[in-house]
């Protein structure tokens, strides 16, 4: 199947965008997308993200800039910082790119972001998600279109193969760059593309098309499942809380899916499999006061017959200056601020309350000191040399 320029243009036009933003790397995919999209009578902004990893990254940026000048298109470049230690470069870079795209999109009334993902990308993503053990949502892979907080993102080339895109570029004399780092198999996607896919092609020459079709089937199935779960979730919810007695009437598999959906709808974050299992066990053996830390930002509590998401206050909500001032007044010693760490409370935190021989869990101390449950979420843990020395604004430890 060859690329139909008119079909691609009509697909873009049906969204009636005020502005088109293109993620433009200079590679063949985004170069073909730029070449087609420039024919629209819609303001177009091409964005080049410089990852600062390749020796030729600046040359590529100049190539993209010159191409945009040739077609009289607006060009924006953005350089990424060094990836934080311990993070996956691929995942981190993807988040950084999307964050910058959305920053630019917010300047326009109805922007549409175009990305050059194609059928082979979809097949690779399906395999990556399968290797991770993902469910339907993960196996659905790369969405063809997705609503964003402001505007949307469309991938018009997703049904076309890499070979078809390269053929279009050759036929239309489109110049593009080649990134030889795509051959580096230390990156998982490159390993799958260069070594695993060729082996699978020996079994099925159309493997990319087949896996892409499987991803589409998973996407359709997941959409149906989410609609049904959303309807059920509404019937067992009270505002943002989940009614436990209604939830546990359902089959275990439905319970787990509803717990995942409930949390995602209210936080825009996903629960891990281990957290879902722990939550499922807790709601089927409910105990008022039970809680679990999901991340540094969210806690889930059981209060009587309801499952509640709590949003612990952060250091930004409480002035760090106020906490240090409180500590200075209540701690009878000199404070070296360079050794002080302030964080949110964790379920297993313990403190040796003054006058006691051994530490107790904070939950027990809160109960003994009759600190109301509604006030406990305000607690900030103050540490020195990795030891808890105080619980703001309640008491000193030690």
Swiss-Prot record:
Any one of the GO BP annotations: tRNA modification
Location within or outside the cell: Cytoplasm
Gene Ontology molecular function: ATP binding; tRNA(Ile)-lysidine synthase activity
UniProt cross-references to Pfam families, sorted A to Z: ATP_bind_3, TilS, TilS_C
GO cellular component: cytoplasm
Entry's EC annotation: 6.3.4.19
Residues that hold ATP according to the record: 25-30
Source species, domain of life: Bacteria
Catalytic activity: cytidine(34) in tRNA(Ile2) + L-lysine + ATP = lysidine(34) in tRNA(Ile2) + AMP + diphosphate + H(+)
Enzyme class: ligase
InterPro entries: Lysidine-tRNA-synth_C (IPR012796), Rossmann-like_a/b/a_fold (IPR014729), TilS/TtcA_N (IPR011063), tRNA_Ile_lys_synt (IPR012094), tRNA_Ile_lys_synt_N (IPR012795), tRNA_Ile_lys_synt_subst-bd (IPR015262)
Keywords: ATP-binding, Cytoplasm, Ligase, Nucleotide-binding, tRNA processing
Principal location listed in the UniProt entry: cytoplasm
Domain comment as written in the entry: The N-terminal region contains the highly conserved SGGXDS motif, predicted to be a P-loop motif involved in ATP binding.
Family per record: Belongs to the tRNA(Ile)-lysidine synthase family.
HAMAP family: tRNA_Ile_lys_synt
Functional summary from the UniProt entry: Ligates lysine onto the cytidine present at position 34 of the AUA codon-specific tRNA(Ile) that contains the anticodon CAU, in an ATP-dependent manner. Cytidine is converted to lysidine, thus changing the amino acid specificity of the tRNA from methionine to isoleucine.
Stated name of the protein: tRNA(Ile)-lysidine synthase
Organism: Francisella tularensis subsp. mediasiatica (strain FSC147)
């Amino acid at each position: 199947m060859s690329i139909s320029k008119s079909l691609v243009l009509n697909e873009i036009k049906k969204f009636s965008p005020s502005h088109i933003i293109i993620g433009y790397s200079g590679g063949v995919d985004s170069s073909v997308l730029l070449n087609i999209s420039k024919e629209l009578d819609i303001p177009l902004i091409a964005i080049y993200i410089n990852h600062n990893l390749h020796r030729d990254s600046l040359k590529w940026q100049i190539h993209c800039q010159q191409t945009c000048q040739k077609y009289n298109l607006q060009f924006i470049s953005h350089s990424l910082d060094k990836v934080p230690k311990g993070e996956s470069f691929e995942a981190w870079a993807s988040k950084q790119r999307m964050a910058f795209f959305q920053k630019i999109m917010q300047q326009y009334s109805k922007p549409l972001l175009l990305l050059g993902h194609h059928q082979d990308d979809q097949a690779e993503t399906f395999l990556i998600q399968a290797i991770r053990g993902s469910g339907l949502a993960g196996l659905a892979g790369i969405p063809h279109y997705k609503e964003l907080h402001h505007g949307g993102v469309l991938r018009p080339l997703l049904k076309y193969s890499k070979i078809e895109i390269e053929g279009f570029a050759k036929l239309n004399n489109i110049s593009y760059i080649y990134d030889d780092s795509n051959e580096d198999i230390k990156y998982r996607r490159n390993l799958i593309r260069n070594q695993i896919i060729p082996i699978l092609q020996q079994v099925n020459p159309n493997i990319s098309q087949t896996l892409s079709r499987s991803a589409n089937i998973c996407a359709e199935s997941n959409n149906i499942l989410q609609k049904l779960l959303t309807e059920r979730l509404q019937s067992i919810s009270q505002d943002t809380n989940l009614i436990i007695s209604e939830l546990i009437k359902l089959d275990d598999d439905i319970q787990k899916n509803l717990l995942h959906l409930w949390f995602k709808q209210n936080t825009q974050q996903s629960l891990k499999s281990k957290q879902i299992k722990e939550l499922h066990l807790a709601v089927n053996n409910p105990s008022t006061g039970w809680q679990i830390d999901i991340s540094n930002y969210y806690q889930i509590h059981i209060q009587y017959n309801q499952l509640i998401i709590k949003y612990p206050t952060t250091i930004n909500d409480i002035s760090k200056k106020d906490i240090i001032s409180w500590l200075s007044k209540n701690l009878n010693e000199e404070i070296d601020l360079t050794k002080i760490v302030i964080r949110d409370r964790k379920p297993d935190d313990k403190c040796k309350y003054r006058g006691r021989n051994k530490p107790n869990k904070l939950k027990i101390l809160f109960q003994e000191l009759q600190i109301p449950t509604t006030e406990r979420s305000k607690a900030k843990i103050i540490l020195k040399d990795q030891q808890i020395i105080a619980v703001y604004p309640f008491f000193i430890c030690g």
